[in-house]
Amino acid sequence: MLREASSLVGLCLALQVAAFSEPLIKFAAPDLVPHGASQIVDHAFASFSFPAHWLPDFAGNNSHPNLFSRDILDLLDRTYYNSSQKESIFVETGANGIPSAVYVGPVYFEAFHNFPGSLWSFQANLANNATWGLNNTLEVCEQVMNTLKSSLITFEIGNEVDLYPCAVRPCDYDIHDYLQEWTTYADAISESVLRGNRYGLDEQKFFQALVFANAELKSFTTPNAFNGGIDLTNHVKSVSLHHYAAGNQAWVRLQETFMNHTAVVANLSIYSPANNYLKSNYPDITFLLGETNSDYTNILMNQVEGVFGSSLWLIDYLLYGMSLNITRFNLIQGTTFGYTGWVPVPTGSMQPYVRPPLYGQIVVADIIGQNPHVQIFPIDLGAEHWKFSAYGVYESTKLSKYVLVNLDEWNSTTRYPRPTQKVTLNFPSGVSSATVQRLLGAGASADSDISWGGLSWNYTHGRLTQSGQPHHEILRITRGMAKLTIPSTEAVVVTLG
């Protein structure tokens, strides 16, 4: 027994030594934007998606606006409109936080006023197969248009129609049946709602199409939809597909599933064929992930969702999506969803609060910054560095930032000290210094005490409040090179001086 115990101690010590001795990684991004960099990034790249039943929580109404959500910001296919309904919203309970039906009244639409300056895409109901379904959709679309006016940018018809067969449609329902329905609805909305509108909205090319749950499933593919004639009437403005990194499978782990650059690459690369098809054949139609986040089951998997490690995953996820020329990610939010960036209303004994994923989005917003010509270049580190990701950021064709994410999972309960990764960075000639900002948390499983560049945010008396002091380090550059240390489970943004 003593001999076995000694062997175990020796193994643990060897693991500890290995944890502290990470090999040096060298990074070099070209001075000028290289081939393989992204298209110019839309400054609305990291947007939000609100299911219909959660919108009142996040936005409020005219008499009780949710100023907490408004500060943070400075619809699903099961929605039916009832013009005589006094309540803003009535929900029929469903599974995983998703209702089986949502009934909304006129007060519901006041929510849109509470995010001034925002642009909206509204999802019109297609799943309702009742005889009154189309008329109800037309009624709600008209109400939405008259509420949002010029802030409305698209109508999206249907939600995850590739999952309709054997659910809300017959089992033999296929892409051709969908195209007939979609065209009928688009023609009707164009003719009855958009035609002659007073808000300058395009009367024809105003629809976000497909909205599939998968990159491809049986006959439901992007090429099949366009070869089948979805744009023969020139209705399609954009194409949306949905993506979630995982569900609640037994194999889901924070390190292997999320804090894993190789997994991020594999997850998002399956959308490249659809995106490339559109760019080659329909270059004026934009491609986006119109509903995306970490977990499609929407349950509280606290060990992988809503923790500091998920904010690091989100940074890598969004930046790699930019590098693939996906135009926008709409990050779905929900009051009870484990991955939501903030809880907008009191729940149980808890007041509203900010959750770790929001920090990932704040960091990405700062990475994009204010320059109108930002491009992202993924730095290939090889398969051996799957727990580290790196990007060069270019502004007006010139290297302006490095983004470095150490995805190695570490927690305050881990039985060895926090490892560090030493890196060297190359810089253009003439650059003598850079600033370093860090996204810090106590560990991958931390759900509080997070800071970005020295600042933290949370809810106080109905508003978003900021605490801390802005903080950055100065990185001295010698002969075009500098060294930097990045602890495990940390992200760093290096901005050239």
Q: Where in the sequence are the language-model features?
A:
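Aromatic/acidic polysaccharide-binding cleft in carbohydrate-active enzymes
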Residues: 294-389, 396-398
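Noncatalytic carbohydrate-binding groove/subsite architecture in carbohydrate-active enzymes
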Residues: 133, 137-140, 174-314, 324
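Conserved, mostly hydrophobic/aromatic
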Residues: 48, 155, 160, 239, ...
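Acidic, Ser/Thr/Pro-rich beta/coil linker or hinge segments at domain junctions
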Residues: 417-488
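Carbohydrate-binding surface patches
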Residues: 382-430, 438-443, 492
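Fungal secretory targeting signals
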Residues: 1-24, 282
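Solvent-exposed loop/turn segments at secondary-structure junctions
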Residues: 51-56, 78, 125-130, 158-165, ...
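N-terminal catalytic cores of secreted or lumenal carbohydrate-active enzymes
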Residues: 20-205, 209, 217-224
